[in-house]
Amino acid sequence: MLVVLGSPNFDSGELGPIAISRLDCCHDLFERKSLVLCTGGWGTHFNTAEHSHAHYAKAYLKRKGVPESAFLEFALSKNTVDDAVKTKTILAKLEAGALLTIITSDYHVERVKLIFGEILDGYVMKFIGAISNLEDKEYEVLLSHEKKAIATIQQNGLYY
């Protein structure tokens, strides 16, 4: 099962470059019997468009050839912790034992492992960091944010 994490899109619903890199990675990994779970709802920092981020992600993957039958319900999340919580709720409705391939961005993998490892404890997971292809300065800003977020989690734990 492929779980592709959401990221910012534009007010128009157009997906941003980080989302596209994650979705292209998902498409590259997709096989005929795969299931796909798209995450991302709405939030002031990543999606203020009419539809959920997951809606736009699914539409993108369908345009690239992923069939409707491959998609699970959306995890309409607000952040990475919420991605894991809502993913767990969806997985609880399915047959146990599937390998989860969690797709995020290269700079985000460490925090995703920390969060999903706690919330989805007991699931077999593989983590893929899609190459973000960002300018060095933008990449460094995101990496700095991730380091601070990880330190906060390690110091205070997760709240969910």
Locations of regions flagged by a protein language model:
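A polyampholytic, Gly/Pro-enriched intrinsically disordered region
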Residues: 143-160
